[in-house]
Amino acid sequence: MGPQSPASRASEAARELNVNSRFGDVAGTATMTSPNVRAQYVSRRAEWGKLVRVVDVDLGGFQMTDSEHATVIVDFQWTRVDDGTLRNTRVLQEWASTEGPWMLVRERRQSGDIGLFGEVIAPTTAAPRPDVQFPTRVIN
C-alpha cells in the first residue's frame, strides 16, 4: 500500500487529537498543535475531567482547502459534573501541514452551548416547585 494522501493524514490527525483529548490526554495531544496555540489549547481544556466531562466527540465534517490546509468540524457532547444536562458544542478547527506533520493551528466554537472550553457560565438553580401530589385526607 502506498503512502497516505494529505487528506487521509489530516483526517487521521484530527481524529487522534480529538479522541485522545476526550479521554484525558490533553498534555499528550498538545504536541499536535502549533506552538503558537499550544498554551491556549491546554488552558481551554484545563477543566476536562474535573468540572467538564466530555461524553462523546464526532468529526462532523472535513474539507481540504488545499494540499496543506484542512478545516474540520468537531461535535462535542459534554456535561458539567455539577449538572447532569447533556450539552452539545460544534467546534471549527483549522489544520495545517506546511512543515511536517499535521498541526491544529486554530479552533473556535461555531455553535452550541458555551462552557466546554472553560468559559464562565452562571450556575443554573431551579426555582422551588410546588408539591405535585394530591393533598392527603384522613378518613376516620
Task: Name each model feature, range by range.
Residues 5-13, 19-73:
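Short solvent-exposed beta->alpha transition segments
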Residues 78-87:
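Short, cysteine-centered beta-strand-loop-beta hairpins and adjacent loop/turn segments enriched
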Residues 89, 103-140:
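Low-complexity, intrinsically disordered terminal/linker segments enriched in charged
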Residues 67, 75-79, 92, 96-100, ...:
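Solvent-exposed coil/turn segments that connect beta secondary-structure elements
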